[in-house]
Amino acid sequence: MDFAPDPEVVVSEHADADCLPIFDAQGHPTATVQRQFANGEAINFVLKRAGQPISACFTYRNYESVWEIGGVWSDPQSRRSGFARRVVSSALATLAQQNRIPRYQVHEANLPSIQLAEALGLTRFVTMEHFLYESPTPSLR
């Protein structure tokens, strides 16, 4: 599938100040995200209405030429309107233009995000299981 940047999605190599709290709330700490942008290892994608984000994501260098698409978000009142598809498609197009390998990680319970990935033609290639050792020693827990 060929992806094209959406003309309404603002693509920037600088973190959008309106997006930082959104990404932070999703587990991407602001200081880490700002450092990724400062190092030239992140790209911001945002779709706005009336000057406010309605959907956003960012990409960041994960390993060598592999770039993660993360922080995918849409305003709760605007969900199921295709906005996330537009920002993620723009991210995929941008990474393709830069000869970077996109990776889209999603939690197994996030069905809307899984459906978005599948609708975009992405295929599942790694499924991870995590195991935890619970030490009987309290100081090692």
Predicted regions and their residues:
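Short alpha-helical
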Residues: 18, 64, 111-112
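A conserved beta-strand-loop-helix scaffold within acyl/acetyltransferase catalytic domains
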Residues: 31-75
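Conserved acetyl-CoA-binding loop-helix of GNAT-fold acetyltransferases
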Residues: 74, 80-97, 114-119
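Conserved catalytic-core motifs of GNAT/GCN5-like acyltransferases
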Residues: 123-139
